[in-house]
Amino acid sequence: MIERYSRDEMSSIWTDQNRYEAWLEVEILACEAWSELGYIPKEDVKKIRENAKVNVERAKEIEQETRHDVVAFTRQVSETLGDERKWVHYGLTSTDVVDTALSYVIKQANEILEKDLERFIDVLAAKAKKYQYTLMMGRTHGVHAEPTTFGVKMALWYTEMKRNLKRFKEVRKEIEVGKMSGAVGTFANIPPEIEAYVCEHLGIDTAAVSTQTLQRDRHAYYIATLALIATSMEKFAVEIRNLQKTETREVEEAFAKGQKGSSAMPHKRNPIGSENITGISRVIRGYITTAYENIPLWHERDISHSSAERIMLPDVTIALDYALNRFTNIVDRLTVYEDNMRNNIDKTYGLIFSQRVLLALINKGMVREEAYDKVQPKAMESWETKTPFRELIEQDSSITDVLSSEELDDCFDPKHHLNQVDTIFARAGLS
């Protein structure tokens, strides 16, 4: 991922240095496991643990000759050791090291992403509670429907991200898995105890069955889950963008002193952060195809997935980490214009209370079709003449003979739409 959309904490996980360090840790743990089984002298393992070092530049230099990165790596590490170097990579095949180490690196990335998710969820919870009773216009098909609250909108986002966190924790169990089962997965030259020891010490699980590789359905599920998280954020970001439109202006991204919105128009204050999240989500989601196409490898192994994953996995995790942090700050610092929310409710002449009038007539004994046919023409007239809906209702004796003035007051009271907000918050775990 380009530096512009990267944070150092996550980017450092995907460096060659960290990748080689992960390979080395797998190699050393394998030696320790062999030693536990009595194959490698403990003194040799001690020397390997103390003296084996990674030199990325030297490994790449060797790779120019070997044309094989793992062979180059093991030879470079061996240069830092004495006679004990013969035990490095003992009984292993390249992907025993590469796939297991990759899962370990992904685990490191996941620990950051999980913290990101938890922080975002906390910010959403705080926003939901702050604006629990702040009435605003609910819109369906982009058109005014009935009042909701900004807190309910935030509660919706909160529960969606809670589901995303749950899914993320589940996919961690699938992706944080190692394998050290040899060239075709049969443990022909390495006992399962080695795999168990290494994976336990790395804090990852073991694959019940593998070939030379871990199966890439795991990685596809992982990328799809991260893409779903990104897409939820995009949905929220698009909502902010729509609510920041000049003619709506119910919320606005924080605008810093000295910030510029346009090179040509000094007045501009644009939702560029939310637009950024929208674009990054598209990039992340685009990798779903790559991840799925990596699943059908040939027989017990090919490396068609390798080049794709070297690009895909860093890009997706780095981009999602960046997006989660940026969007958390956007939501946390979001300006909410409560007066504009109320003014927008009043823009449609009270039409948003049409269902309340309809239900009141039904409750008084009128059949639904008759009630609907009485209310709808008044609503259409209100739209077309810009006349307050209640005024037109009160001019129709067939309605006022059924509904008293007090009953109409109740129909047109926006606070009615707050009646179940506490229930919604309790169900969301926000009470």
From Swiss-Prot:
Domain of life: Bacteria
Reaction(s) catalysed (UniProt annotation): N(6)-(1,2-dicarboxyethyl)-AMP = fumarate + AMP; (2S)-2-[5-amino-1-(5-phospho-beta-D-ribosyl)imidazole-4-carboxamido]succinate = 5-amino-1-(5-phospho-beta-D-ribosyl)imidazole-4-carboxamide + fumarate
Keywords: Lyase, Purine biosynthesis
One of the record's GO molecular function terms: N6-(1,2-dicarboxyethyl)AMP AMP-lyase (fumarate-forming) activity
GO CC terms, sorted: cytosol
Keyword rRNA-binding set for record: no
Family annotation (SMART domains): ADSL_C
UniProt record, GO biological process: 'de novo' AMP biosynthetic process; 'de novo' IMP biosynthetic process
UniProt xrefs under InterPro entries: AdenyloSucc_lyase_C (IPR019468), Fumarase/histidase_N (IPR024083), Fumarate_lyase_CS (IPR020557), Fumarate_lyase_fam (IPR000362), Fumarate_lyase_N (IPR022761), L-Aspartase-like (IPR008948), Pur_lyase (IPR004769)
Top EC class, one word: lyase
Subunit structure, as described in the record: Homodimer and homotetramer. Residues from neighboring subunits contribute catalytic and substrate-binding residues to each active site.
Protein name: Adenylosuccinate lyase
